[in-house]
A protein has these predicted regions:
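Enriched for short, Lys/Arg-rich terminal
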Residues: 1-6, 10-25, 55-56, 64-85
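A short, surface-exposed loop/turn module that caps and links secondary-structure elements
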Residues: 29-54
C-alpha cells in the first residue's frame, strides 16, 4: 500500500497521452513508485520554483509533495528539452 497518494494534474495526463507507449509505461511506473518514496535517489529539487523532478530516460516528471496530507501532485511530464519551459 502506498504511503502517499498520487494526484495527476490535467496537464500531466495530457502529456502522458503524447508519449510513445514504451516510454509511457516506464514513466507511469516511476510515478507509481513516488507513492512509496516521494524523494527517491536521483530526485532533485527544482531551482526557482517549488517541486522536484525525477529522470526517466529522456523524460522528466515534475511534481510537488504535500507532506501535510501525504499527497504527491504530478504537475507535468515531458521530454527533457520541453518540460522546464
Amino acid at each position: 500500500m502506498s504511503k502517499y497518494r498520487i494526484e495527476l494534474r490535467p496537464a500531466a495526463v495530457k502529456a502522458l497521452r503524447r508519449i510513445d507507449p514504451q516510454d509511457r509505461s516506464r514513466v507511469q511506473g516511476a510515478i507509481a513508485l513516488l507513492g512509496e518514496d516521494p524523494r527517491p535517489p536521483g530526485a532533485r529539487a527544482l531551482q526557482g520554483r517549488d517541486g522536484y523532478r525525477v529522470r526517466v530516460g529522456n523524460y522528466r516528471i515534475i511534481y510537488t509533495i504535500r507532506n501535510d496530507i501525504l499527497v504527491v501532485v504530478v504537475v507535468t511530464v515531458g521530454h527533457r528539452r520541453d518540460v522546464y519551459g
